[in-house]
Every structure is written in structure tokens, then in C-alpha cells.
Regions:
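ABC ATPase nucleotide-binding domains
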Residues: 1-63
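Hydrophobic aliphatic residues
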Residues: 17, 62, 70-71, 112, ...
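Nucleotide phosphate-binding site architecture
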Residues: 32, 50, 56-59, 68, ...
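Residue-level detector of flexible, active-site-proximal loop/helix-junction positions
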Residues: 48, 74, 143
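ABC transporter nucleotide-binding domain
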Residues: 52-81, 85-87
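Non-catalytic connector elements of ABC transporters
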Residues: 77-192
């Protein structure tokens, strides 16, 4: 379906399902549809049930990288590189060090959601402890919001912010996010 029709159909389905008092099974490949229409979501991979829960639970506690990616997360890969206070430092494959409030051992995969990432033209001076700098590799306008990609991270910002910051493909920029905005979703040394 085109984007406009999809929104209309989703709204009609929400209304229809709200009036039913029977369990209903919906099948979709779109997490936004699942989140909008379902009380409970089951993620099936290669014929096996990978995780079930509310849409909020799946985003807050994805069972593995596939579920995190399905729910919209950016995935970062690295190795734990020490700890301080209540955070673990993770050295990414490119050498960048990220802080997370989660703990893991061995090779880890971190999930960072686009709505937790802030984009700026200058190095941020705020409470976001994690900063990745680089050239903007993609800018995609999605109606009233835009997706901006820097290195391994995509951020979702308003189109007003995109215009105000003057962000364009190829420009140098900074993507920042808090340690609390990361989740370890895979750990070679055991369950995160």
C-alpha cells in the first residue's frame, strides 16, 4: 500500500479490532503495523518464534539483534573495554568507544534507536556521553520527519530541525546519544 492508504487502512483496522472481543491473529512484516494494531507481538524467524511481548517490551528488551533491527534499532558491534561507575565502555569495530548502562562479555551488539540519537553540526556539550562524528551519508525526508545517517547510526529528526541545522549529504556532523539509550542485545560471553 502507498503511505497514505496504509495510514487509513491501519486506522480502519484499529477501529475494527477495538470492537471485536475475540483474539485476532494479524501477520505483517512491518513493526509499525504490529505496534499500532497489536496488544502482543510475536517475532518469527525461519519458522521459529524468537520473542513475544508487547510492542513496548520488544523495543525496551529485544531478545537479539534480529528483533532489535526489526523494531527499528541501529546495531553497533564491539568489545567491552572496561567499566566505570554504572557504565560499561564498548570499543566499536572502528575504535570508537561507547558507554552503555548494560553489561556483557566478549563480542557484543548494541542497539540504539533512531529517536534516541541527536544530530548536531558542532560537537555537543550536553549529557549525551556517546558521540560519533563523520560525514552524513544519507538524508531521507519522510513527511514531517527526516532520517539522517552518520556512519553506523541513523537518527530521526523533524524536518524543521533538518532545515534549521542545514544538514546535507556529505557534510560533517555529530550523532550523540546517552548511555541509557543503548541496549546490549547480543553477547558472546553469555546473555546480556
Amino acid at each position: 500500500l502507498d503511505a497514505h492508504t496504509k495510514v487509513d487502512v491501519r486506522a480502519e483496522l484499529q477501529e475494527l479490532l477495538a470492537g471485536l472481543e475475540i483474539p485476532t491473529l494479524l501477520v505483517t512484516h512491518d513493526f509499525e503495523d504490529a505496534a499500532a494494531l497489536a496488544d502482543q507481538v510475536g517475532v518469527i524467524v525461519e519458522g521459529r518464534l524468537r520473542q513475544t511481548g508487547t510492542p513496548v517490551d520488544l523495543v525496551a528488551h529485544p531478545a537479539d539483534p534480529f528483533v532489535a533491527s526489526f523494531t527499528g534499532a541501529n546495531l553497533l558491534h564491539g568489545q567491552p573495554d572496561g567499566a566505570e561507575a554504572n557504565t560499561t565502555r564498548v570499543r566499536l569495530e572502528d575504535g570508537t568507544v561507547i558507554s552503555t548502562t548494560d553489561h556483557g562479555e566478549g563480542a557484543v551488539t548494541l542497539a540504539v534507536y533512531p529517536w534516541d540519537v541527536t544530530i548536531s553540526r558542532t560537537r555537543p556539550d550536553d549529557s549525551a556521553t556517546n558521540v560519533i562524528s563523520g560525514a552524513i551519508t544519507a538524508v531521507t525526508e519522510l513527511g514531517n520527519r527526516a532520517r539522517v545517517t552518520i556512519g553506523p547510526l541513523s537518527a530521526e529528526i523533524t524536518v524543521d530541525s533538518l532545515r534549521r541545522l542545514g544538514l546535507e549529504h556529505g557534510q560533517q556532523a555529530f550523532a550523540s546519544f546517552k548511555a541509557t539509550g543503548t541496549r546490549i542485545v547480543a553477547s558472546k560471553g553469555g546473555t546480556p
